[in-house]
């Protein structure tokens, strides 16, 4: 009898959750009991951004679905998007996250992407100086050195019109740059860095089992994380290798600092992100911040990091800084190859503003048309759109819709970026000139997010892309060939990356 009562209680609990949106009168895809539509969000061959677009066409600009035990609302109305990301940030300061990612407030290894409230503010404040114009200027020499290494390889590979998978080359470049800037790698290791294989595996391996089961059975998260990290189940291999590499690098630097201190040697100017974070290191395991009274205007003076937070920060910068910039470069290149007139116009700008072999920060700042080209590429392919998802932290109302605390809100960025009512009838055209118009709806452009949680590394990523593209376009013209996928096929979950990008590089005369 007791077993039957427990079983009935469990079934009732899951059914009550499954019908959450139905009881609130909001349309949306049903999914299956316990897991909801989690499977659709974990599909690798059909990026979730496409899935949300499909559902939005069917259910409208605001609808709901369940993803495991999490209740998810989807928004693509520009006014409501601004309400969530900017105007009501105090009510949506948390990010959507799966239980296996840990508790943003209590877990010791939460990084800036997953943190929220006062903890996020502390991490953001400490990290922000690394992405100021002054700091970025200092790493331009490193970027230039990695660029020259890539150019050598491109010269070898592009002879006689050979098809080159540009996405793989961009991955080599961006990983080389971020390894040197963030982790202190002294010299270029392009095309010979063994860690890159595991970093790629971190993104490419589909760990749907742990995401699915942790979402459907959040009470089992500790056990699932143990299986993942300690036993190596659910494709944990690449994650474990990368995590160990970052941990070893940080702990080695700490040991070196302690040895130097014994000999009276003080730390000099921070040479990389590890140094910068260690300058803020505190001898505590956890600060225990409470977000009960958090508001975006709240003052908070803690400027310290725990050792585990330093490791987590370095980890997220390494993997995120590598993946996103390589994907963006790939899509820009794809659109240039498809639009020869636009590519020619961009080459003219580069030739004019960057006449010498060495390219400076000030010269890159003058490449306004290149800014437009990158923006337009990211408008059409907002590949990291899930970074715009938020968690409702306090009961509130947006428009006429009640949103309860604990509900996740996903911004359907793909629909918003392809909305004729927002961008006009030429919305599907690759048209960089649209960004010259003062009427361009800047507030509807979310490739780097909006509001207080706008992408911290935006300026770094743009400089990295502009520097490399300038060097390539001074020497070559991108062209399609028989191996080019037309249209390009996108795959992936957290980010929508190209399956491949085979192009020819025609030397300029």
UniProtKB/Swiss-Prot annotation:
Keywords: Heme, Iron, Metal-binding, Monooxygenase, Oxidoreductase
Tagged with keyword Membrane: no
Protein name: Putative cytochrome P450 CYP13A8
Principal EC category: oxidoreductase
GO molecular function terms attached to this record: heme binding; iron ion binding; monooxygenase activity; oxidoreductase activity, acting on paired donors, with incorporation or reduction of molecular oxygen
Cofactor requirement: heme
Similarity comment: family membership: Belongs to the cytochrome P450 family.
The protein's Enzyme Commission number: 1.14.-.-
Residues the entry annotates as binding heme: 455
Function: Cytochromes P450 are a group of heme-thiolate monooxygenases. They oxidize a variety of structurally unrelated compounds, including steroids, fatty acids, and xenobiotics.
Domain of life: Eukaryota
């Amino acid at each position: 009898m007791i077993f039957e009562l427990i079983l009935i209680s469990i079934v009732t609990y899951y059914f009550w959750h499954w019908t959450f949106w139905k009881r609130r009168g909001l349309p949306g895809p049903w999914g299956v009991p316990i897991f909801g539509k989690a499977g659709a969000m974990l599909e690798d061959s059909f990026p979730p951004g496409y899935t949300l677009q499909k559902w939005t066409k069917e259910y409208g600009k605001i609808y709901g679905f369940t993803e495991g035990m999490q209740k998810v609302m989807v928004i693509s109305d520009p006014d409501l998007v601004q309400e969530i990301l900017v105007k009501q940030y105090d009510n949506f300061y948390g990010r959507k996250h799966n239980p296996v990612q840990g508790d943003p407030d209590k877990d010791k290894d939460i990084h800036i992407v997953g943190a929220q409230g006062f903890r996020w503010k502390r991490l953001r404040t400490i990290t922000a100086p690394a992405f100021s114009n002054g700091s970025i200027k200092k790493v331009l020499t490193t970027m230039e050195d990695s660029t020259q290494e890539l150019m050598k390889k491109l010269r070898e590979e592009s002879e006689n019109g050979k098809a080159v998978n540009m996405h793989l080359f961009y991955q080599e470049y961006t990983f080389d740059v971020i390894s040197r800037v963030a982790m202190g790698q002294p010299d270029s290791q392009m095309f010979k860095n063994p860690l890159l294989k595991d970093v790629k595996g971190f993104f490419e391996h589909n760990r749907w089992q742990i995401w699915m089961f942790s979402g459907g059975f959040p009470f089992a998260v500790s056990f699932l994380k143990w299986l993942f990290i300690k036993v190596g189940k659910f494709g944990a291999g690449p994650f474990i290798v990368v995590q160990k590499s970052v941990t070893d690098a940080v702990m080695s630097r700490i040991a070196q600092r302690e040895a130097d201190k014994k000999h009276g040697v003080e730390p000099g100017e921070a040479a990389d992100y590890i140094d910068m974070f260690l300058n803020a290191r505190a001898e505590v395991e956890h600060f225990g911040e409470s977000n009960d009274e958090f508001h975006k205007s709240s003052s908070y003076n803690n400027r310290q990091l725990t050792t585990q937070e330093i490791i987590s920060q370095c980890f997220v910068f390494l993997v995120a800084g590598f993946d996103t910039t390589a994907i963006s470069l790939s899509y820009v290149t794809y659109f240039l190859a498809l639009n020869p007139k636009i590519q020619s116009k961009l080459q003219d700008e580069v030739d004019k503003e960057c006449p010498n072999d060495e390219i400076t920060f000030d010269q890159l700042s003058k490449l306004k048309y290149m800014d437009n080209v990158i923006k337009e590429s990211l408008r059409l392919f907002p590949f990291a759109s899930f970074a715009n998802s938020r968690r409702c932290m306090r009961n509130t109302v947006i428009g006429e819709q009640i949103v309860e605390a604990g509900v996740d809100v996903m911004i359907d960025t793909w629909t918003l970026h392809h909305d004729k009512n927002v961008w006009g009838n030429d919305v599907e055209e690759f048209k960089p000139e649209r960004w010259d118009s003062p009427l361009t709806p800047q507030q509807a452009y979310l490739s780097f997010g909006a509001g207080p949680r706008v992408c911290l590394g935006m300026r770094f990523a743009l400089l990295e892309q502009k520097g490399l593209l300038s060097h390539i376009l001074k020497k070559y013209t991108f062209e399609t060939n028989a191996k080019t996928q037309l249209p390009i096929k996108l795959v992936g979950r957290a980010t929508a990356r190209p399956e491949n990008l085979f192009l020819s590089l025609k030397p300029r005369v």
